[in-house]
């Protein structure tokens, strides 16, 4: 089974549509949270994911739509964007986010936004030592995660920055982050996603160019913080 792994779309419809257009043949699309926040098209992104039957878990920005008190943990521009998002979400979109689980499974593997540690949504996986502690508890399976906006693979041998376009063999125990569709932070502004072949035990990472200027124009028209527009072109 081949699974498309998308994460951190962040209301960026142009980036999502570019990814979906470039997507190779897969059996399932899995979204690893943070569907909304930062960007200008939360309802459009949700509608698109619903239309393709994508499976998704909840991220911290999605959680903030349901639990506004969590905004105290956000930086000022992220909180401002989240408040704007909450105001423009339709009742149908809000129900969709409320129905998302905090964690899920893809075959025998795990799918979360932050980490496989409860409550699954908030923890960042950033270094080898932290990843190794998680891998010991995870056992012989993979965990797909997002949250950091950085395409990465963590194994018992350490952190790997994956090459683009190559099929990479992955050991039985691994943490796999496809990077961010809507707000990459690795210095490359192109949308990032991955495809996992569960039978071949391999993962392929992809980057896709999209119309950043259109997204930036929408951000400015909506009155969202300027940093959300500027950072898209920088990939930061």
Task: State where each predicted segment sits.
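Anionic-ligand binding region
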Residues: 128-167, 171-176
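Active-site neighborhood of phospho(di)ester-bond hydrolases with catalytic His/Asp-centered motifs
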Residues: 6-7, 29-34, 55-60, 112, ...
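Active-site environment of divalent metal-dependent phosphoester hydrolases
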Residues: 10-15, 37-40, 61-66, 119, ...
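Short, glycine/charged-enriched secondary-structure capping and boundary segments
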Residues: 18-22, 44-47, 70-73, 125-126, ...
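N-terminal active-site segment of His-dependent metallophosphoesterases
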Residues: 1-54, 72, 218-220
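Active-site neighborhood of divalent metal-dependent phosphoester bond hydrolases
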Residues: 45, 51-112, 118-139
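Acidic, His/Gly-rich catalytic cores of divalent-metal-dependent hydrolytic chemistry
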Residues: 155-236
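Beta-strand-turn-beta hairpins that frame and shape the catalytic cleft
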Residues: 1-4, 105-111, 169-174
């Amino acid at each position: 089974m081949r699974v498309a792994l998308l994460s951190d779309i962040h209301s960026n419809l142009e980036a999502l549509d570019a990814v979906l257009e470039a997507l190779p043949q897969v059996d399932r699309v899995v979204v690893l949270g943070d569907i909304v926040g930062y960007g200008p098209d939360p309802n459009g992104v949700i509608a698109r994911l619903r239309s393709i039957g994508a499976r998704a878990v909840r991220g911290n920005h999605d959680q903030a739509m349901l639990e506004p008190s969590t905004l105290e943990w956000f930086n000022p521009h992220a909180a401002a964007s989240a408040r704007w998002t909450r105001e423009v979400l339709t009742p149908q979109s809000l129900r969709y986010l409320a129905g998302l689980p905090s964690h899920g499974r893809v075959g025998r593997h795990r799918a979360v936004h932050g980490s496989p540690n409860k409550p699954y949504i908030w923890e960042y996986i950033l270094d080898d030592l932290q990843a190794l502690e998680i891998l010991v508890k995870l056992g012989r399976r993979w965990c797909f995660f997002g949250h950091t906006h950085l395409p990465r693979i963590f194994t018992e041998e350490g952190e790997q920055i994956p090459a683009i376009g190559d099929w990479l063999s992955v050991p039985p125990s691994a943490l796999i982050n496809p990077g961010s569709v809507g707000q990459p932070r690795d210095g490359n502004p192109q949308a990032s996603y991955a495809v996992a072949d569960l039978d071949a035990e391999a993962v392929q990472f992809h980057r896709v160019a999209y119309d950043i200027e259109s997204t930036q124009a929408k951000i400015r028209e909506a009155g969202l913080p300027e940093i959300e527009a500027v950072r898209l072109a920088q990939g930061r």
